[in-house]
Amino acid sequence: MDSAVTGLYPLHRCKTLHLVRHAQGIHNVEGEKNHDAYLSYDLFDAHLTPLGWQQVSNLRKHVQAHGLSKKIDLVIASPLLRTMQTAVGVFGREGYTDGIGAPPLMVANAGNSDHPAISSLNCPPFIAIELCREHLVIHPCDKRRSISEYRPLFPAIDFSLIENEDDVLWMPDVREEDEEVAVRGMKFLNWLWTREEKEIAIVTHSGFLFHTLNRHSSIKSEMCKHFANCELRSVVIVDKGMTGSDAAKTDYPGKIPNGLDLPSDVAKDKH
């Protein structure tokens, strides 16, 4: 067996990530027609199109059919309308009812969605993280709203890890370099080791995903292609540096009760 292509790692040093690009947003449509449209403030914090919501519905069916919805411990979303709409639409629960004791993941019609409220009942936690924002260039579609505007729209999403009320990252005249996006992506992956969750869905953006995955030369041929809208790819990350603190939860020490257990091959070597 070629050790160069096959690796063996302890399970508790691994996490499974389900990477998702947001569904079609209004900026995708207008930008396809005319690239200069990306500079329009009419596309500020772009929301999903009706077609985008259809894409969300189809990915949701796929996630449920393959049992992923029952495995995921945490959902992370970039704090923009299109990513949060995609995240709650795919991984949330349908049929929210007032008075059930759990706030909705999304209220009805949030972000011009014309979509019913989405329940958080029996869902994993949802958190918003700035590190997985889109490649920050000069497009208003990538500028976020204030956190106080988002909270009433997405009551069950946790925004507590976002330090600034207003968007201090996006600037109208400064472009984030490709390498800066990749460094931010690696910082995000390293941050995941501070979390105890083992199976995580991440709803983010094409540019962020491309430049982050492009840093991993061993998977370039298979993974370093631009994501389609609402595409999902699953990967495993490994804590080779043993920076995480998680103990092995499924390992079992054996010898309970204690007894003699000299292996036969060791016994052979002693004779």
Show the residue positions of the predicted features.
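Short coil/turn segments at secondary-structure boundaries
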Residues: 31-33, 140-142, 214-216, 247-249
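Active-site-proximal alpha-helix that buttresses catalytic centers in soluble enzyme cores
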Residues: 1-123, 127-128, 148-153, 178-185, ...
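Short, surface-exposed amphipathic charged segments that create phosphate/polyanion-binding patches used
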Residues: 140-149, 176
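Short glycine/proline- and acidic residue-enriched helix-loop micro-motifs
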Residues: 42-46, 133, 158-177
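Acidic, His/Gly-rich catalytic cores of divalent-metal-dependent hydrolytic chemistry
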Residues: 247-271
